[in-house]
Amino acid sequence: MRNFAVIMSITSIIRPFFRSRYRAIERYGTHAEEIQRKVLAHLLQRAADTEWGKRYGYESMRNYEDFAKKVPVNTYEELKGYIDRMRHGENHVLWPGQVKWYAKSSGTTNDKSKFIPVSREGLHDTHYAGGQDAVTIYLHNNPLSRLFDGKALILGGSHAPNRS
């Protein structure tokens, strides 16, 4: 009688995590409005003590209608002064604490790049989660995939500081 070792692939070991995540992603489609209301309430609560949040009274806002009524749509140029202050280290301007990361646009308006603030919370809750969700959906749609069992190429943005 021979001994056979069962070798589990990395993909098969982590697949249950992705199945669980896929159920949460499906819920986004069936409960989108409820989830968006909760996210807005969380963001308003988090930003209530910032300069921007105090200016527009985030603390008293209870729903999207309050937000839409009190906070005007702003252009990048109207926000640039706030963003520049944040880039120079000022805290609690548009978001609580210090924002250290900025996404740099390719410059579509006025031929100049724009710096979009990316908080630590935003980095984790959207950028990182978005990558995980893309893999989750891929594995769901390709159940025979062995994505993590071989080589992979991952492209990302620069971590080099931009001093301009």
Predicted segment positions?
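Nucleotide 5′-phosphate-binding alpha/beta core
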Residues: M1-K104, N110-S164
